Regions:
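Conserved class I S-adenosyl-L-methionine
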Residues: 99-107
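Conserved SAM-binding loop of SAM-dependent methyltransferases across substrates and taxa
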Residues: 108-119
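A short acidic, Gly/Pro-enriched loop at the edge of an enzyme's catalytic core
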Residues: 158-160
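Conserved alpha-helix/loop element of class I SAM-dependent methyltransferases that forms part
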Residues: 80-97
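N-terminal auxiliary segments of SAM/dcSAM-dependent transferases
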Residues: 1-61
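Class I SAM-dependent methyltransferase SAM/SAH-binding core
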Residues: 121-156
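Acidic/His-rich structured neighborhood in mature extracellular/periplasmic domains
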Residues: 83, 87, 114, 132
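Class I SAM-dependent methyltransferase Rossmann-like catalytic core
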Residues: 70-84
């Protein structure tokens, strides 16, 4: 299987009529210096002025938010699932330090951002959803992580 061909085809998903407005909104986001607090809530903070009402508008365009919670400069995104509870339950049982970590079905990347607390060598997420990728891109625009998000499904893993 040619994964590059699959990636190119999946990139076209970003032009779908329900996704294109999200991608346009993401392209308009300002570059600001921000800090990330990785706790139960993946929280972003900045000394710079942030247009929180514009962030809320964009976040609402991206609903539903399944995994989280997130706090974007004071805008709390209360997600459908309390992913922090599951993560906190499992975290004592793994060591990610220096390891390559894959998140299969990564959704918006909540767990991948939490993984950063443990300094893994590399984090790669797999999820074939243009909406979830857009949510991830919103958060990562400010986190500025090296996380790799692949618009690939479980069926592509043997070829990765």
């Amino acid at each position: 299987m040619d994964l590059n061909a699959v990636r190119q085809e999946r990139q076209k998903w970003m032009t779908w009529k329900n996704i294109a407005p999200l991608r346009d909104a993401l392209s308009q986001l300002p570059q600001i210096d921000s800090d990330v607090e990785l706790g139960n809530t993946v929280a972003l903070r900045s000394q710079e002025t942030v247009n929180v009402s514009e962030l809320e508008r964009i976040a609402r365009l991206m609903m539903p938010w399944r995994k989280g919670p997130f706090d974007l400069f004071g805008l709390f995104i209360d997600t459908e699932w309390r992913s922090d509870l599951k993560y906190n339950f499992l975290r004592p049982h793994f060591n990610l330090s220096g390891k390559k970590v894959a998140d299969i079905g990564c959704n918006n990347g909540y767990y991948m951002f939490r993984f950063l607390e443990d300094s893994p060598a590399k984090v790669v997420g797999f999820d074939p959803s243009a909406l979830f990728k857009s949510q991830f891109d919103l958060i990562n625009h400010y986190v500025k992580s090296d996380i790799v998000y692949e618009l690939l499904g479980v069926e592509h893993l043997p070829f990765y």
